[in-house]
């Protein structure tokens, strides 16, 4: 029985690594910066605030794949990246694109940023004390993290990217399909 379990576990690992390799092979352009984890990483539970100071958390998105983006209104690369995140949300509505303004970002500034960038589909969420960012080891901005439906980190991209690129959409679609 033990030998059977070892063989079964080994086959599972080979299959899991092959699936990860298939997804990794889809990385082109900016997506080459995407680091995929071999083992999912737990994410801390932290209260996030919306524009009206209502409380939310990443648990609100359990059961869905999440593209979690850490950004700030003063961040120039974030300004370039945000419209592509909005277009990604339009292209892949079954995946939650969740931008979190980390640090001191006033709601009027966020709303002005969204208006200037023509962001229409993304929620306004804030991490005013940078608790989530610190808990996840975010040192600079922007940082985008991919969460599986269990709320665990499975990938991370440091810096800005074109999230509505064919490569990004192919990677996210493959992950969501269970590859």
Q: Where do the protein language model's features map onto the residues?
A:
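Bacterial N-terminal signal peptides
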Residues: 6-15
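Short active-site neighborhood of thiol/selenol oxidoreductases, capturing the structured segment around
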Residues: 56-79
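Structural microenvironment flanking redox-active thiols in thiol-disulfide oxidoreductases
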Residues: 79-117, 128-134
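Thiol/disulfide oxidoreductase modules built on the thioredoxin-like
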Residues: 114-121, 127-174
């Amino acid at each position: 029985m033990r030998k059977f379990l070892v063989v079964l576990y080994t086959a599972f690992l080979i299959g899991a690594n092959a699936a990860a390799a298939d997804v990794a092979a889809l990385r082109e352009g900016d997506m080459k910066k995407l680091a995929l984890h071999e083992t999912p990483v737990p994410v801390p539970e932290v209260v996030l605030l919306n524009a009206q100071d209502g409380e939310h958390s990443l648990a609100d998105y359990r059961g869905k794949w999440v593209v979690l983006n850490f950004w700030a209104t003063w961040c120039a690369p974030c300004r370039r990246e945000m419209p592509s995140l909005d277009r990604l949300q339009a292209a892949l509505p079954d995946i939650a694109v969740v931008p979190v303004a980390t640090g001191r970002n006033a709601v009027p500034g966020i709303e002005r940023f969204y208006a200037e960038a023509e962001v229409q589909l993304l929620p306004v969420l804030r991490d005013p004390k940078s608790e989530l960012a610190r808990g996840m080891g975010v040192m600079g901005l922007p940082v985008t993290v991919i969460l599986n439906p269990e709320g665990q980190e499975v990938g991370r991209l440091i810096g800005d990217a074109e999230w509505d690129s064919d490569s990004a959409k192919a990677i996210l679609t493959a992950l969501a399909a269970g590859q």
